[in-house]
Amino acid sequence: MHNIHRRHFLKAAGAVTAGLVTANIALNANASSVAPKPRVGKSVIGLIAPKMELVRVGFIGVGERGFSHVEQFCHLEGVELKAICDTHQAVIDRAVEHIVNQNRPKPAVYTGNDLSYRELLNRDDIDIVIISTPWEWHAPMAIDTMESGKHAFVEVPLALTVEECWQLVDTAERTQKNCMMMENVNYGREELMVLNMVRQGVFGELLHGEAAYIHELRWQMKEIDHKTGSWRTYWHTKRNGNLYPTHGLGPISQYMNINRGDRFDYLTSMSSPALGRTLYAKREFPADHERNQLKYINGDMSTSLIKTVKGRTIMVQHDTTTPRPYSRHNLIQGTNGVFAGFPNRIAVEHGGFGKSYHEWDMDMQKWYDKYDHPLWQRIGKEAEINGGHGGMDFVMLWRMVYCLRNGEALDQDVYDGAAWSVVNILSEQSLNNRSNSVNFPDFTRGAWKHATPLGIVGA
């Protein structure tokens, strides 16, 4: 989306969001204490769309993230890239050129204003839409996509308010269309191996998980006129909480079968002082630069604790400001042992190749040899060649297309996207109420109690 439009929309969205948050806290800090609205359709847990011989794809947003999806789809069989939409001509031209250079038909192009995507949605030769736009557009575009009779696949996070989460759930249930937040980290090799190990009982009964998005991104503040930093920077002036919870939380949630036998119950959150971006702006920009006029309020480190209905605990952290190595934690603790990421290491009481659980086993190869996930065994080499965050992007898109072409349910649904994304809002609500706990809405309306647990997905 064009930067001028982004800024205007973001300012308006920020004002609305601030009002909604204030109202929510004033009226009721516990977001789920009010009973959910009656379901207007039927649950989409396990939704299976009619088989598609070819998956016809439209793209809304082909900038940095969107273009990477265009690249990956060009590697996939059984897909047609029908149309693209963006408000920035340079990224449109790049995407069209790449598609044509891959010996695929030239896609239709939609541009001109922020609502041009609706022209793309009016087409009757598109099955799914890939949405890779600034965060504030995710929910509105996904809702419009489902209303147009198409399946929505949305970049993270899925939504920015509790009400948006409910609107997405209600629309998916009423239209019986998929709305999948594309949490690519769930398809990383390590994450899928751990899922396999969890399902085989290697760690025993699960007790605790730790998730994070710790990724120093201050350099994005220098992206002024376009690219991610041109709009993402402003969120650090709008909210104080976990702005981006899903990369770490998605895999932990699937290990624990959240929304499929357990669910998030309540959350408490704290944030550190917000110092790093102000200091960075003073160091890297002239005194009169806009970046030095902004008031950064989002704490450099956000830490939330989640309690599940079954009593399990999850720590979720967010830090894109301080100078430190990248981490998503990816820790899962059970009664028989633990896996922790960054760096990968394992300690188990029984079944640990003779190594004591009092010390970490850092040699992953023997664990891969025994527990490497079926998806990576099948397409891992192809994923590594095609890239995309170490191959996880390719595996995710391959799996999406496989499910659609073979009449299988997707691995992530609208309830997952809503539950993982709503941590953004609830962490802010808790923080603004002296870190008192805030209840999670039950977006499944009780269906989590009887939903089939996610298995060791394969192909």
UniProtKB/Swiss-Prot annotation:
Predicted to be exported by the Tat system. The position of the signal peptide cleavage has not been experimentally proven. It comes from the Bacteria. Its EC number is 3.2.1.-. NAD(+) binds at E64, R65, D86, W135, E136, W137, H138, E155, V156, N184, Y244. Binds 1 NAD(+) per subunit. The NAD(+) cannot dissociate. It comes from Shewanella sp. (strain MR-4). Glycosidase. This is Glycosyl hydrolase family 109 protein 1. The keyword Nucleotide-binding does not apply. GO terms for molecular function: hydrolase activity, acting on glycosyl bonds; nucleotide binding. It is an enzyme of class 3 (hydrolase). The keyword NAD applies. Keywords: Glycosidase, Hydrolase, NAD, Signal. Its cofactor is NAD(+). Belongs to the Gfo/Idh/MocA family. Glycosyl hydrolase 109 subfamily. Substrate binds at Y213, R232, Y244, P245, T246, H247, Y326. Residues 1-31 form the signal peptide.
